[in-house]
């Protein structure tokens, strides 16, 4: 991006072709090469000016064009210069890109989020492979069309789930851009609108333990999701090493193994699947909330 940096985009033939094409949609994803020590330390003060000038050149070529500015894709920790300045310069640029989008009146597209926890999709620590490119393509498609696949909630939401008592309850998910999302639970009704990135959140008032079960309903004009037998209670997160992998069914103590389980206890078992990086969600269809009994407590 930097006009005095390493291989400036404005000096490439691709830039001249883009101007001559004068497209209606302009998607800009530049800046990674500007983390080069030949660029950022010397010319970083020009970054905002050069970026705004680039946007203006496309608007001059086509005054009716719409512009999307992209937060940069990740740089993995395996990059040879990651700890020698590149990491810090990368985050400086990301902050400036967000400000540039605001100043220019352009729409911001986040290309970092989808690959941030997937270094396995960046073979050279910088460029995505085919699967990573597919994630970027879907992100850009959603930003341009507003189509994020309709109403969706994380897999942790299911029938029989337990919501933490006496705490405000954030309910979050994805819907198509601009869709109105309505959430109802225990006499409460909250509404919001999905943002340009498809994300939405509403916060419900705290629930007290009452012994009652509820239906959580989340809806848009095109889809409705109902989660039944939802209760308020204490939610405990159990994780760790081999001690948490030990199953009750494998205990030698038959008395403990065969002890009746109170039916008020509910379990959400995240079945382990090997991954190269931490995941924000899981896709195992067997991970759902269940009421504990002899058939599942030993698993």
Each model region followed by its residue ranges:
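Histidine-centered active-site loop/cap adjacent to the catalytic His
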Residues: 123-150
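Extended, solvent-exposed functional surface patches
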Residues: 234-299
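Extended acidic/polar, glycine-enriched regions
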Residues: 172-251
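Short, solvent-exposed loop/edge segments of extracellular or virion-exposed proteins
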Residues: 152-162
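Substrate-gating cap/lid alpha-helix
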Residues: 74-111
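Structural recognition of the beta-strand scaffold that forms the well-ordered cores
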Residues: 24-30, 66-71, 107-110, 127, ...
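Conserved SGNH/GDSL esterase-like catalytic core that processes O-acyl groups on lipids
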Residues: 1-49, 91, 234-237, 242-251, ...
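Structural beta-strand segments of beta-rich domains
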Residues: 159, 167-171
